[in-house]
Amino acid sequence: IYEKEGYCGTCHQENGLGLPDSGFPPLADTNWVNGDHKRLIKLTLKGLMGPIEVKGRNYPGLVPMTPFESLLDDYDAAAVLTFIRNSFGNKSEPVFPWQVNQVRNEIKEKSGFYSPAELLTTHPN
């Protein structure tokens, strides 16, 4: 899933280091990946748009992160998030399909992208 054309690896790269000069942040060793699993699930399902700071570097967020809500079922979302949370030097707890389903139901009425600021307000860690 990670390496499928147009999915995670396209912007964040095979090595998880992203393309900083093009505005795509890394997934390696960042609290956005290793922090609150609910925050990660939300941004994966609904997408992300707006300025974001990752590992001390500011990214303008002009190109939004694709919302995968209609592209990934609960099992595939959990699988790719667990992969990301345990690759590129990351070592975090897995994400389970029931957790994705729970968050999916909680946010089903939300329309549009999340902003980093919005997610940090509800999930600071």
Model-identified regions with their sequence ranges:
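Sequence/structural segment immediately N-terminal to covalent heme-attachment motifs in c-type
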Residues: I1-D21, V33-K46
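Electron-transfer interface patches adjacent to heme c in soluble/periplasmic c-type cytochromes
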Residues: P26-K42, G50-V54, V63-A78
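Secondary-structure transition/capping residues
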Residues: G9, S22, N34, K38, ...
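Structured segments of extracytoplasmic/periplasmic soluble domains
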Residues: E5, E14, T30, L43-G47, ...
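Flexible coil segments in periplasmic/lumen-exposed cytochrome c-class electron-transfer proteins
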Residues: K55, Y59-N125
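Short acidic (Asp/Glu) and glycine-rich catalytic loops that position anionic groups and cofactors
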Residues: L19-P25, G61-L62
